[in-house]
Amino acid sequence: LDVVVVNAGRGLAGGVLSSDESQWQEVYGVNVVGAAYLLRRAGQYMTQRKSGDIVVIGSVVGRNVSPFSGFYGSSKFAIGAITEGLRREICQYGVRVSLVMPGIVVSEFQDVAGYNQENFGNAVSQFGKLLEPQAIADGILWLLTLPAHVNVNEIMIRPTGQNYP
């Protein structure tokens, strides 16, 4: 096992006041606790081997919270903090840990998370062409092909026209 990509993502539309509180524990269970379990196991294994790459998929709203996804964004803030904590804990063992924070990607994520015209808006007309999943995969591949002594701790990948968040 050379690479682990932690891509836990359970979205939830709305902020603290408007999101469905019955879903809060599930969001944190998947995005934070579930991801942390995988990070622990991967970190333990890779520190024993003294090599490896761990890539965590966060979100731009984990750095710049949107009022339309404040609760989800808070879970991505949390996994970002855990990722950086793990990086500091295991970097001396030759294990690289990186956080990738995508902007808006064309996928089923928004529908499943409950976003609609009111809380998501017309992203294409506002931001232009949105990201395809391949753009994120290309960013991850770039991280992984850097020399072993180089670790890009964080990378934010947005559509060129996405000025918020």
Residue ranges and their predicted role:
Residues 14-15, 41-53:
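A short helix-coil junction within the Rossmann-fold of NAD(P)-dependent oxidoreductases
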Residues 15-16, 23-25:
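Substrate-binding pocket helix/loop in short-chain dehydrogenase/reductase
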Residues 19, 65-74, 85:
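Active-site loop-to-helix junction immediately N-terminal to the catalytic Tyr of the SDR YXXXK motif
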Residues 39, 75:
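Active-site helix of classical SDR
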Residues 44, 88-91:
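Alpha-helical segment proximal to the catalytic Tyr-Lys
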Residues 59:
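Residue(s) in the substrate-gating loop at a strand-loop-helix junction
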Residues 95, 99-103, 119-165:
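C-terminal helical subdomain
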